[in-house]
Swiss-Prot record:
Higher taxonomy: Bacteria, Pseudomonadati, Pseudomonadota, Alphaproteobacteria, Hyphomicrobiales
Coiled coil: none
SUPFAM superfamilies membership: C-terminal domain of RNA polymerase alpha subunit, Insert subdomain of RNA polymerase alpha subunit, RBP11-like subunits of RNA polymerase
Protein name (database record): DNA-directed RNA polymerase subunit alpha
Top-level lineage group: Bacteria
Length: 339
């Protein structure tokens, strides 16, 4: 037994299906199938943990408010106290290019509401939730705040954002760097051919808009891939590349596909099996009348098969010259990647 069989003979997802939500930059559902039994839970849990804890993003580290010495103060003419203002600042979502720390400022006079959209940013910082309310100013009130923005990962508590030489009036803020806000997943049964014992992994991802959900999942998968490399203690034997000579066929290679690989109901599949219909090439040569004479084969099964064939550009009653070929089993194996 070659060592490659340990991973090469496991089934792998055909593709990742991404369905965007109401806002494609923030919401999406991703489906991967089929997976080996148990892999849905394994991959879903690992990806969820990495998505929430390990992706890089930008956030406010600290704020300096003119005339304020500490976060337990109040500001004349400002309805919220400083503690509430700091909590609102923590919810500012940012996208930043390059390295930090960087500065951004907001200055406003009342009456009115100060929002994240009022913040003056440099060119490589974008406020992603400009409607977020920071504080409310009464008539004649004025406020000026200077924010320190940096990049990081996961969640960093305010205490860790306080530098040792912090000036008086610098208020550290809890930093939520992760661009991912919510992740959930579920694992269901799925089928591959006639086998139902596989996993289907469905992930629902919400971001703050700094990353699209599918990019976030891609980065999380890359992190896991990089972390797992240290456990691989061998080099794979190099595969000799030989140019395979593909014979010319007098018919569509899809005819070499076995009918049990089609996603048919159990009843329809059993009827075909009982009638010794093994390959699609056997099936398409049958007429509708011939199919309806098959025991236990009804109009519902006929319509199901016609629909599946139509999706492949095929139909019943076709003429297939040169069918069946003498070496049909060998040809089916050689052409399995071509249909």
């Amino acid at each position: 037994m070659t060592i490659q069989k340990n991973w090469q003979e496991l089934i792998r997802p055909n593709k990742l299906q991404v369905t965007a939500g109401s806002d494609a930059t923030r919401f999406a559902t991703l489906v991967a199938e089929p997976l080996e039994r148990g892999f849905g839970q394994t991959l879903g849990n690992a990806l969820r943990r990495v998505l929430l804890s390990s992706l890089q993003g930008a956030a406010v580290q600290s704020v300096h408010i003119d005339g304020v010495l500490h976060e337990f103060s109040s500001i004349a003419g400002v309805r919220e106290d400083v503690t509430d203002i700091v909590l609102n600042i923590k919810d500012i979502s940012l996208k930043m290019q390059g390295e930090g720390p960087k500065r951004m400022v907001v200055k406003k006079q009342g009456p009115g509401v100060v929002t994240a959209g009022d913040i003056q940013t440099v060119g490589d910082i974008v406020v992603l939730n400009p409607d977020l309310q920071i504080c409310t100013l009464d008539e004649g009130a004025e406020i000026r705040m200077e924010f320190t923005v940096n990049t990081g990962k996961g969640y960093v508590a305010a205490e860790r954002n306080r530098p040792e030489d912090a000036p008086i009036g610098l208020i550290p803020v809890d930093s939520l760097y992760s661009p991912v806000r919510k992740v959930s997943y579920k694992v269901e049964n799925t089928r591959e051919g006639q086998i139902l014992d596989y996993d289907k992994l469905t992930m629902t991802v919400e971001t703050n808009g700094a990353l699209t959900p599918d990019d976030a999942v891609a980065f999380a998968a890359r992190i896991l891939q990089d972390q797992l490399n240290v456990f691989v203690n061998f080099e794979e034997p190099r595969k000799e590349v030989t140019q395979e000579i593909i014979p010319d066929l007098a018919f569509n290679p899809a005819f070499l596909k076995k009918v049990d690989e089609l996603e048919l109901s159990v009843r329809s599949a059993n009827c075909l099996k009982n009638d010794n219909i093994v390959y699609i090439g056997d099936l398409v040569q049958k007429s509708e009348a011939e199919m309806l004479r098959t025991p236990n084969f009804g109009r519902k099964s006929l319509n199901e098969i016609k629909e599946v064939l139509a999706q492949m550009g095929l139909h019943l009653g076709m003429e297939v010259p040169g069918w069946p070929p003498e070496n049909i089993d060998e040809l089916a194996k050689r052409f399995e990647d071509h249909y």
